[in-house]
Amino acid sequence: MRLMLLRFILLLWLSASLLPTPVRAGQALTPVNIATSAAGQSGYIAALIENKKLDTKYGIKITNMMMDFTEAANAVKLGRTMASSMQPSTAVNLVKSGTDIRLITPQIWSGNSWVVKKDAPYKSFADLKGKKIGNFARVTGAYFFSAVIAREQKLDIEKDFQNVPAETGALIALLERGEVEAINMFEPHTTRLVMSGKYRVLLDFDIELENIFGAPPLKSSVGLLKETVEKQPALVKAIRSAYADAIHMIKTGQDDDFFKSKAKELFNLSTPEEVSAGFKQNQANAADKWGDAFFQSQNKILQSGISLGLLPNIGDLNNLWVK
């Protein structure tokens, strides 16, 4: 009986040691600099963590270094921050360049769609073959996802379509003027376009790629150096816990009031209808999957990009992910 009791106590101790532990009163907070986008969904998650003190709950104090997405992704490589928001495809490029990155927690799905005018005759993405389409630059994750979707439909994004590269605002203007038939667009801009009554979604990237690969494409994760992950496991656990709490709040709708307070600043949503639609879309785009099955789905998406020549071959893609 005593032996069984000792085994039970040991089991409880081991279980507790694997769980994130909230900080005790008076315990010093460990500073963590994280590069992230100042606006949009990545910026929103960062603001939510700060506002709700989800970081200090686990003994860390996150300072968000606001940058554009490309700059943020390279901040760890340049030694400017300990961690950074980045796309898995960016992590692949960083590993190839000699910066050994590990992804530790999910943030958001792609949220991208092919958007057309409401009265456009197109019923499928394939119907756009040979047409002018507005797309992001070839080096972006948004372009990467569009190329993978085309490949899976036995099309070539570069050969079968007339790509017109542009930034967000210019893409919307191109569609408004009728200079392209469709644009690759992301949230919250897609929501605002659809809410105007003039446009519709032709193809949702997240739905399409989940149907093909078993999970939506991850647009943003938190990346750290392999050395940091190996030497500071408690810190990694704390960062993951803060982000997991934020994602849980979003998925369960507990951030309703906070979203409304940030809708204009971070998403440029103004009317009650836009805010309501944006809230639902933000909830849907919060990424809450992790683990082996999820990693395999993302690896297949990345491998498709490698086959297209959009990404370098770095060997075993499983090494990117921290379970």
For the regions a language model picked out, list residue spans one by one.
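Short, glycine-/small- and polar/acidic-enriched structural segments
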Residues: 26-165, 174, 181-187, 202
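Positively charged n-region of N-terminal signal peptides that target proteins for export
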Residues: 1-7
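Pocket-lining segment of extracytoplasmic ligand-binding domains
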Residues: 89-90, 164, 169-263
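Secondary-structure end/capping motifs
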Residues: 229-310
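Hinge/cleft segment of the Venus flytrap/periplasmic-binding protein
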Residues: 310-323
